[in-house]
Amino acid sequence: MIQRESRLVVVDNSGAKEVLVIGILGGTRRSHVNIGDIVLVTVKSGSGTVKKHDVLKAVIVRTKKGLRRKNGSYIKFDDNAVVLLKEDLNIIGTRIFGPVVRELSDKKFSKIVSLAQLVL
């Protein structure tokens, strides 16, 4: 379960390696998020185009908790991962590492699905 103060892995080539969740967008009383939700993060480690302590938006692409599909199956991952976004919700990086779920295209993140190495 991803909530405030959770540390997440960044899976794009923006330069950040690890981020910390400082806010959850989409409501005042939301306590946790799932795949496809947008969070407010701060960069904890990494180098490149984004610097340490930068505050950015990110979309959740993998969770340990997993995602339940309409056919009843679950997809779970080994880590909690995000892709960093600009203010206009376009992705910062040009590559996505590792698998992502195809349900991201239903949530208007089809660019992430098209750039991913593996779509489940």
UniProtKB/Swiss-Prot annotation:
The gene is rplN. InterPro entries: Ribosomal_uL14, Ribosomal_uL14_bac-type, Ribosomal_uL14_CS, Ribosomal_uL14_sf. Pfam families: Ribosomal_L14. GO terms for cellular component: cytosolic large ribosomal subunit. Coiled coil: none annotated. This is Large ribosomal subunit protein uL14. Part of the 50S ribosomal subunit. Forms a cluster with proteins L3 and L19. In the 70S ribosome, L14 and L19 interact and together make contacts with the 16S rRNA in bridges B5 and B8. Belongs to the universal ribosomal protein uL14 family. Binds to 23S rRNA. Forms part of two intersubunit bridges in the 70S ribosome. The keyword Membrane does not apply. GO terms for biological process: translation. The keyword RNA-binding applies. Disulfide bonds: none annotated. GO terms for molecular function: large ribosomal subunit rRNA binding; structural constituent of ribosome. Keywords: Ribonucleoprotein, Ribosomal protein, RNA-binding, rRNA-binding.
